[in-house]
């Protein structure tokens, strides 16, 4: 497309079907003369919630479903666990693919998705319920419980689990960084959410390796990811200029 042609015009090489962390590593890139490396893999690895029933055939992860929704048969009634943009994407996609009753369950009295994404989901016919936690998944649907908050939105108590009938449960509550590049690169560390830790300039604890977007912040909007990437790109230029001035 025109963006790809623009990149080639600028002298940028594109190497398709190449994974960093397999046959090639970050160390290999530095060995061959790269001065800085940007990691923008996104948060495209499902992260388990550690609840009973996640292995059942009627339980799916949002990141897997969104990659190829046509191979899934979710049924008429779908429960979507989570309140981020990926949860909205799952809900809207399920409606478009034929599911009739799609409900999004948020853990708090609010959402982490953008207001626009929520508006689109509601317009498409999705329902949203707030202050719901997930206890487990059964063949008949998820076991949820009510979460009670005070006026300052501090959690006060949680109710007993109850069944919400659903043909399928899609977990869109947690995603983490692809771990292959992390496992094979010293100095890249993750926080407890599985996201890459960076400083204010987007540099990881490995000098010269930078990162931004979903892999750092978690699933969010393209606008935010692009904004962060521009900031980090400028920091990478400064980093290289400073290193070259010392040599």
Give the predicted meaning of each segment:
Residues 2-52, 135-142, 168-170, 175-181:
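Feature captures the FAD/FMN-dependent oxidoreductase FAD-binding
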């Amino acid at each position: 497309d025109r963006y790809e042609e623009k990149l080639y015009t600028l002298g940028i090489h594109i190497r398709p079907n190449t994974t960093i962390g397999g046959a090639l590593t970050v160390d290999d890139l530095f060995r061959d003369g790269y001065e800085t490396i940007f990691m923008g893999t996104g948060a495209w690895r499902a992260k388990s919630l550690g609840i009973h029933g996640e292995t059942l055939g009627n339980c799916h992860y949002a990141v897997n479903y969104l990659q190829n929704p046509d191979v899934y048969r979710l049924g008429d009634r779908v429960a979507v666990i989570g309140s981020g943009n990926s949860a909205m994407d799952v809900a809207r996609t399920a409606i478009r693919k034929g599911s009739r009753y799609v409900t999004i369950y948020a853990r708090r009295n609010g959402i982490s998705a953008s207001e626009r994404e929520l508006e689109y989901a509601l317009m498409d016919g999705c329902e949203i319920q707030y202050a719901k936690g997930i206890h487990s998944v059964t063949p008949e649907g998820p076991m949820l419980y009510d979460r009670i908050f005070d006026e300052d939105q501090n959690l006060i108590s949680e109710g007993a689990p109850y069944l919400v009938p659903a043909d399928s449960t899609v977990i869109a509550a947690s995603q983490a960084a692809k771990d292959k590049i992390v496992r094979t690169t010293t100095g890249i560390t993750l926080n407890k959410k599985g996201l890459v830790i960076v400083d204010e300039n987007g540099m990881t604890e490995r000098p010269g390796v930078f990162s931004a977007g979903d892999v750092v912040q978690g699933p969010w909007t393209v606008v935010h990811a692009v904004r962060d990437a521009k900031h980090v790109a400028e920091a990478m230029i400064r980093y290289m200029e400073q290193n070259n001035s010392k040599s």
